[in-house]
């Protein structure tokens, strides 16, 4: 793994991460662990799992920070870490909300009809 290449991200409030590969591996693994608790047929799990596995494979395969940033196409690795933290929070909320379950009550017949 390449050492720290910069002293600042140039983004207010976003500090440089000294171990971005390790941090991303941990976050992506946690996301996948949470997704395991969501049914396999849930769209959120299916697509998020696919994207997260792809990103995790890139992190494991590319030791160079700059090349990894280019592959992930999410900005600086610190920004990618922030995105992964947000995805982990969302995955936990999706697990809690159980959006794959049927609605408690039927929606109104013309709920999505427009114009009224």
From Swiss-Prot:
The keyword Isomerase appears for this protein: no
Entry keywords, A to Z: Acetylation, Electron transport, Membrane, Mitochondrion, Mitochondrion inner membrane, Respiratory chain, Transport
Pfam family, one: ETC_C1_NDUFA5
Residues bearing PTM N6-acetyllysine: 30, 46, 60, 98
Recorded GO MF terms: NADH dehydrogenase (ubiquinone) activity
Disulfide bonds: none
Gene Ontology, cellular component aspect: mitochondrial inner membrane; mitochondrion; respiratory chain complex I
Keyword Mitochondrion carried by entry: yes
UniProt-annotated location(s): Mitochondrion inner membrane
Positions where N6-succinyllysine occurs in the chain: 98
Membrane topology, record value: Peripheral membrane protein
N-acetylalanine carried by residues: 2
Tissue and organ expression note: Expressed in all tissues examined with highest levels in heart, skeletal muscle and brain.
GO biological process: aerobic respiration; mitochondrial electron transport, NADH to ubiquinone; proton motive force-driven mitochondrial ATP synthesis; respiratory electron transport chain
Function, in words: Accessory subunit of the mitochondrial membrane respiratory chain NADH dehydrogenase (Complex I), that is believed not to be involved in catalysis. Complex I functions in the transfer of electrons from NADH to the respiratory chain. The immediate electron acceptor for the enzyme is believed to be ubiquinone.
Assembly information from the UniProt record: Complex I is composed of 45 different subunits.
Similarity remark: Belongs to the complex I NDUFA5 subunit family.
Listed name of the protein: NADH dehydrogenase [ubiquinone] 1 alpha subcomplex subunit 5
Species for this entry: Homo sapiens
């Amino acid at each position: 793994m390449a050492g720290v290449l910069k002293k600042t991200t140039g983004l207010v409030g976003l500090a440089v991460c000294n171990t971005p590969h390790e941090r991303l591996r941990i976050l992506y693994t946690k996301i996948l662990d949470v997704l395991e608790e969501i049914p396999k047929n849930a769209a959120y799990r299916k697509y998020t799992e696919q994207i997260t596995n792809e990103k995790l494979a890139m992190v494991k395969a590319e030791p160079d920070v700059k090349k990894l940033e280019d592959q992930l196409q999410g900005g600086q690795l610190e920004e990618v870490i922030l995105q992964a933290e947000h995805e982990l929070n969302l995955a936990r909320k999706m697990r809690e909300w159980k959006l794959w379950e049927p609605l408690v009550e039927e929606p109104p017949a013309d709920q999505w009809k427009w114009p009224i």
